[in-house]
Amino acid sequence: MKTALVTGGAGLIGSHIVDGALAAGWDVRILDNLQRQTHREGKPDWVPGEAEFIQGDVRNRRTWERALDGIAVVFHQAAYGGYMPEIAKFIDSNGVGTALLLETIRDKNLPVRKVVVASSQAVYNEGAYRCPEH
């Protein structure tokens, strides 16, 4: 059986990827830090019991080593969505976390076949906004 890792798998987009991978017959492992700003009540009810769940930080190399064990495909959705005024936190979580993912695969010579890095809900923002020109 093929195993997919979905980082940020407890989040909005990641949870849909988890559902789709399970429906397609994949084994799924979720890596999510359950950041309090997003998950005030802890692990959400929509996280499926048949998916393995690791609570961890993408900025930790040991977390990556554990999460990537036996993985064929990574869907990398973990991201810190806020950026102002915490630009350093944004770069640390999103940039360094992704770099550690790729370094861990390379350094451990892991047989990961694909890494899918997609955008997040940040591209369409939150709430209703009006454009003065349209």
Which residues make up each language-model segment?
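N-terminal Rossmann-like NAD(P)+-binding domain of SDR-like oxidoreductases, especially those catalyzing
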Residues: M1-H134
